[in-house]
Structures are given as structure tokens and as C-alpha cells.
Amino acid sequence: MKRAALLAALVAAPALAHHVELLPPLQFVPPPPGSYQLHRIMPAPEGRVLDVDGRGARLSRYLHDRITLLGFIYTTCADPDGCPLAYRVFDALKEAIADAPHLHGKVRFVTLSFDPARDTPELMRRYAGSRVVEADGGLRWYFLTTRSARELLPLVEGFGQDIRVSAAGRELSHVLKVFLIDRAGYVREIYSSNFLHPQSVLNDIETLLLDQR
């Protein structure tokens, strides 16, 4: 089975290449899928979230039964090494997974705002554009927010996501972190901007799928 998954990953690699042209070059050679382990780091925290239709649910609804890639963003972020970078990586991975049928139905993305005062469900829908629903069986990409900073707090604290607010309270900043979560809801990898690259993330997804068979 490991050989089959590795072969599938190698077949997917050329398809991935044309999606990463605008991303910084990979500074290291990622090990092949299945040649390493990703140990449990922590259980993903629980909290209340809202989808783009304003429907409330527990975050755990979006973190089980599939491999989940979760990133915190805010829609007004202009730091090229922050939210825009994460968005480009997620977008490249989405296209690569669409080209890899063996990954269909096994992966989801979650983009969660940490600016609930501005990032309403309606605004998150506009931010998502056409990415909310994948009709080709590739994956589902959820864009979520919260009702208030109070409901957001246990999530950012639980994930260890650093957020800073300017003295005037008008500007936000954060250190980019993206979380790879297994089908049981455990964080298995945390990516910073230096290590967030579609090929390394794709290899980690393949490794988790091999590990959880």
C-alpha cells in the first residue's frame, strides 16, 4: 500500500508544479510520503464557529473523518508572508488534489478568521468566492468566523495562534501558522511561513493517510 501511495504522490507532483509558480521556492527537499512519522502534537481545541451562511456549529464538526488543513486569517491582511501566502498555498493544494483522484473525499480545508468584528459570514462568503464548494469530488473548503472575540478566544489560545492588536485597536497582525489535523482531530504538524509549501504539505497528507489505514 505504501508503494501505491508513493506512486500516486509522484504522479501528482508534476500536476502540482504548475500551481506553485508564484510561490517562494522550496528551501529543502521534503522526504517522500511514508518514509517518516508525524506524531500527535495536541488535540485540536473546541469552540463555536459560524459558516458563510451564518449557521453555528462546533469546530469539531469540521475536524474529523478527513485530513484537515486549518489556517487563521483576516480578510484585510496585506502581509505577503501572512494570509496571502497561506491562501496561495491552499489554492495550489486544492488544484493538486483535484488532479489526484486517490485524495478525493479524504481532505478538507478550513480557513478561520480571527477578526470577527469585520469578517462577518457574508464577508467570508465574498472572500471565499467560488472556493466554498467543490463539485468535482476533490475537497470541501470551509470559510468560518465566530460571533465575537469572546467565542474566538478559546480557539486562538488552544491552537497557540499569536495575534497582536495595535494600540489604536484598528490593525491586527499575527505570525502565520497552518495546522495539519488528522481524522481523529489531533494536530500532527504546524507550518510556519518558511515551511508552508504545497509539496511538503501534500507529502504530509499522504503520510497521514498511510499512517491511519
Task: Name every feature range the model reports, one short phrase each.
Residues 42, 66, 73-76, 81, ...:
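Sec/Tat-exported extracytoplasmic proteins
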Residues 42-44, 62-69, 104-109, 119, ...:
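Extracytoplasmic
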Residues 57-58, 188:
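Generic structural signal for well-ordered beta-strand positions
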Residues 85-155:
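Structural microenvironment flanking redox-active thiols in thiol-disulfide oxidoreductases
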Residues 151-213:
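Thiol-/selenol-based redox modules, centered on thioredoxin-like
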